[in-house]
Structures are given as C-alpha cells and as structure tokens.
A protein has these predicted regions:
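Beta-propeller fold recognition
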Residues: 1-113, 119-222
Length: 222
C-alpha cells in the first residue's frame, strides 16, 4: 500500500478480549514458512484494583493480509508480576529459543519455540544471582533490576544485564553453581555509573550493550 511506504488499512480491530497484554517485551519471530511472522506478547489478568501477570504467552500470526487471534501457551511457572515494568524479550538467531526478563523480578524465563505452530515448550525459570553494586546505602534492590538479555551466536550462553553487572548463563549447564559467570561490573564509582541497559546482537555476532539514560556516546560489546 501507499507505493511501498506502508498505510494503515484497518484499525481498532479487536483480537484479544477479556485478557490484556504486558506493556513491554513484545518481540517478533519469522514463521517457518519464511513469509509470515509470529508476534509474541506476555499477558496479564485484570480484576478491579489488581493487576497480576498470568502464566501464559500469546502468539499472533501476522500475514500480509491479516493479524490472527493468538495461539496461547500456558505455563506452570510463574512469569512476571507487574505489567507496567520494563523488560526485554528475545529469540535466538534461528528462532527456536525464547527468553525474557522483567526489571525488578531478578528472574529469567527460557523456553523452546516452534516456528510452525507458534507454541512454546520446555519452560524454565532462573533466579539471577546478585552482586554488590558498591553502594553502601543500597547494596541489593538496585542490582535486582534485570534490564535486558541476549543469546550468544551459538545459543549456548545467555547474557543478562543488571544495573551494575553483566552475567553469562550457560543454558546447557544444569548446575546453578557453575552455570553462571560474572562478565563485568562497575568501571567507575557506583554513583557516577550510568547503569547497564538493553542488549542486542549485531550482524558481526557481537553482543552490544547500551546504558540507561544514554548519557554516554559509546556502546560496549561482549
């Protein structure tokens, strides 16, 4: 439409009723057919005066003609508790693994993804270790803010950014004592450090890292 520039041809189409979706952590993954896309959002249940995350993920099939009602995957594991918190959701490079984290939960959610059906399986929730943020007045709750995450090119490792630390999780290692590795912490005094932010893999297969507030004109990479 619009000479290839795009155009809104339908609006206000209701595709989800009764349930609502989390504000953050929307991500897309190409369908196995190579043409269509899956749009993925976590959901929350609403009751008057209470917002609570449900243990399910909605996957919408997006084609060139329409957006279809979601495929719903239910989980026993509790996901994230606050719909209004920031976070990040990602797929690995071949779209077979999904991971998500939400600021303030100090948890990482991991699952397999079927690009043919849009269904998740084999869910697992990790508790992210805390490290001292070197703030004598506040050494715990700030570092529980898991801001972002990204897979390594091989998918063996998952990198997680916290306010003052970068961690590596070996998802093939079932021993929590050896699966975690501390990659980086502060490179200056805590009160001058801008805090780590989202992660994203580049075309060069390096994992790039931003900073909260964007007060630096540079990025780091792993």
């Amino acid at each position: 439409a619009n000479g290839g520039a795009g155009k809104v041809i339908q609006r206000s189409k209701i595709i989800v009723e009764q349930d609502s979706m989390l504000k953050a952590m929307m991500i897309a993954c190409r369908h196995a057919n190579g043409k269509d896309w899956w749009l993925v959002k976590q959901m929350y249940e609403y009751s008057p005066g209470n917002l609570k995350s449900k243990n399910k993920i909605a996957t919408f099939l997006v084609t060139k003609d329409s957006v279809y009602p979601p495929v719903i995957t239910y989980f026993q594991d509790f996901l994230f508790s606050d719909y209004d918190q920031a976070g990040q959701a990602i797929f690995n490079q071949d779209g077979t693994k999904y991971a998500a984290t939400c600021r303030g939960t100090n948890k990482v959610f991991l699952a397999d993804f079927d690009r043919c059906t849009g269904i998740f399986s084999n869910p697992k929730t990790y508790n992210v270790p805390n490290y001292s943020c070197h703030n004598p007045n506040d050494s715990s709750w700030v570092d529980s803010f898991t801001h972002g995450l990204e897979f390594s090119p091989s998918t063996q490792f998952l990198y997680i950014s916290k306010s003052y630390n970068i961690l590596q999780l070996d998802i093939t290692d079932n021993d929590s004592a050896t699966a975690w590795y501390h990659v980086a912490g502060l490179d200056t005094a805590w009160n001058y450090f801008p805090k780590y932010s989202r992660l994203s893999i580049g075309y060069d297969n390096k994992v790039y890292l931003g900073y909260v507030g964007a007060i630096r004109n540079t990025m780091s990479h792993i």
